[in-house]
Amino acid sequence: MITFVKKELTMLDSLKKIAIGSDHAGYKYKEYLKKYLQSQQFTITDFGTDSEESIDYPDPVHPLARAVDNQDFDKGIIICGSGNGVAIVANKYKMVRAAVCWNEEITMLARQHNDANIIALPARFISPEQALSFLQIFLTTDFEGGRHLRRVEKISQTL
């Protein structure tokens, strides 16, 4: 088991601009997380969806991932039923490293070892409280660099 120290999530952190989006399955979680982040004075841009009416998950994820890829945002949050669909779409973009996070250790390692810049949450498999906990870990865990930097740089290389 890896242990970690949860840092305080404040505006003193270098993160300020967060992109968030979901499909219908993740809508309630998106709204819950958005409300929390706004209460912490983060600047949030919501890429949709705006209801629980069924939509195709690539529709909100493509513009969100493109914006993270262009470094318009510090981090991104995407949510669908499994987390997989939204992560697959986001990872089409060269500088995006979207990680499906379903527990604290996976979330921490996604940041420490993979420098994930988008968290993908599986709304059908975690509670809203777990989603918030994972998001706090995601936003406060630093990338370790070192040997991991070399590996992360290889991710964005064109094949």
Model-derived segments and spans:
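Short, high-confidence coil segments that cap the C-terminus of an alpha-helix
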Residues: L15, D72-D74, D115
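Short, structured coil segments at secondary-structure junctions
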Residues: Q40, Y93-K94, N114
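Structural motif
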Residues: E53-H62
